[in-house]
């Protein structure tokens, strides 16, 4: 646990803050647009679910990229922190940032009197965890930021057309489907854990 805390301390200031800020801004964009455009509940749900999916990609697609990789190398060399804890600490910190961002968006919806505000906090976080986990896994395997962003974007586009199975759709509330997003959230956590596992065992780029 002390190694994990040290890894988070080393990594937090220089690597994760801008990604978390980008996610927060994207999350808050949907309620603000809904407020200005006088959207219906279903239209607002679609906007929030779309924004949260994009926020997950923004926060996690750059998880393993070169400038952050150099920071990991320095932390491991200087402090003797195990490699996997640095990647895991970064992923956990960004998941926490996504949860806070999702709750902030839900509070903004509630302030507008929206009937879907509480549901959107969990739905938005599940979307962000899934698309972010998918982006991180693509990044770990490919080493390409473009591919890491492209595959979740493709999933997003196909899903928006209604072609994804209901248990894995990003747009449960927008499509008026029953059930919750627990399977989507768990799939996102699994993808993110697999991404950290893969990255830990791949050699650093020179």
Which role does the model predict for each range below?
Residues 85, 146-147:
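Residue-level recognition of membrane-helix boundary sites in multi-pass small-molecule transporters
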Residues 1-50, 55-67, 129, 137-143, ...:
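Hydrophobic alpha-helical transmembrane segments
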Residues 104-130:
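Membrane-interfacial helix-loop-helix connectors in multipass membrane proteins
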Residues 30-39, 105-114, 162-172:
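Juxtamembrane "helix-exit" motif on the non-cytosolic side of transmembrane helices
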Residues 16, 81-110:
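Selective transmembrane-helix segments that form parts of the transport pathway or gating/packing helices
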Residues 53-58, 89, 115-120:
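Short alpha-helical transmembrane interface motifs in multi-pass membrane proteins
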Residues 62-93:
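Helix-loop-helix units of permease transmembrane domains in multi-pass membrane transporters
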């Amino acid at each position: 646990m002390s190694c994990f805390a040290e890894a988070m301390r080393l990594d937090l200031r220089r690597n994760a803050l801008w990604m978390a800020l980008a996610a927060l801004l994207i999350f808050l964009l949907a309620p603000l647009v809904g407020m200005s455009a006088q959207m219906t509940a279903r239209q607002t749900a679609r906007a929030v679910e779309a924004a949260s999916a994009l926020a997950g990609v923004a926060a996690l697609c750059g998880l393993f990229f070169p400038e952050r990789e150099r920071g990991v190398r320095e932390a491991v060399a200087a402090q003797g922190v195990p490699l996997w804890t640095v990647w895991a600490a970064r992923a956990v910190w960004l998941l926490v940032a996504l949860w806070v961002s999702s709750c902030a968006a839900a509070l903004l919806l509630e302030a507008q009197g929206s009937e879907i505000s509480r549901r959107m906090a969990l739905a938005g976080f599940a979307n962000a965890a899934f698309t972010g986990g998918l982006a991180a896994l693509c990044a770990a395997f490919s080493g390409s930021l473009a591919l890491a962003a492209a595959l979740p974007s493709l999933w997003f586009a196909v899903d928006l057309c209604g072609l994804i199975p209901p248990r894995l759709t990003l747009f449960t509330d927008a499509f008026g489907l029953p059930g919750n997003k627990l399977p989507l959230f768990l799939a996102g956590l699994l993808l993110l854990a697999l991404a950290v596992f893969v990255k830990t065992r791949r050699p650093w780029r020179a």
